[in-house]
UniProtKB/Swiss-Prot annotation:
TM region(s), chain numbering: none
Organism: Caldanaerobacter subterraneus subsp. tengcongensis (strain DSM 15242 / JCM 11007 / NBRC 100824 / MB4) (Thermoanaerobacter tengcongensis)
UniProt signal peptide: none
Subcellular location as annotated: Cytoplasm
One GO cellular component, as annotated: cytoplasm
Stored CDD domains: UBA_EF-Ts (cd14275)
Function: Associates with the EF-Tu.GDP complex and induces the exchange of GDP to GTP. It remains bound to the aminoacyl-tRNA.EF-Tu.GTP complex up to the GTP hydrolysis stage on the ribosome.
PANTHER family from the UniProt entry: ELONGATION FACTOR TS (PTHR11741), ELONGATION FACTOR TS, MITOCHONDRIAL (PTHR11741:SF0)
Name this polypeptide is given: Elongation factor Ts
Encoding gene per record: tsf
Pfam families on file: EF_TS
Amino acid sequence: MISAQAVKELRERTGAGMMDCKNALIEANGDIEKAIDILREKGLAAAAKKAGRTANEGLVEAYIHGGGRIGVLVEVNCETDFVANTEEFRNFVKEICMQIAAANPKYISKEDVPQEVLEKEKEILRAQALNEGKPANVIDRIVEGRLEKFYKENCLLEQEYIRDPEKTVKDLLNEMIAKLGENIVIRRFARFERGEGIEK
């Protein structure tokens, strides 16, 4: 028997609907952590279904960090102004601003990395592996593995979420899509850091 308290806790932690929480707990035999994983998997499925829908409402949010040391401007889109005006959506956009301020991504997704940047990175990684004396037959695999690290450092959606390293920003986005029932797109951002690019 699944307790109402467990359902309530799962709802508070995931934002999923009551029946979804109850069913996930039944499937997980009452294990809340396992139920969270089940909901996240289902959330990903829900997010994939919504990905094709047009998102042209949303918010532009500004965030200034550290007494004016770092500034971030971000645009996040959703499908309706109703969702754009919810506290959950606003908080999500603020979280994205803080993520960008703290983790300094260069791109939104892997697909946004220019081909020439990727080729240059692969060249550097290949040279590093050769200099380390790695056998030629495993170099490509090593480069691919290290390229994943490059993506995790430089692509917003691949980064560890600053408040929960178990999640990526993409996981957070997919949870929000599942919770709010609309396609949500992180459209663009700009990050400024005082003194950046100035010769010291």
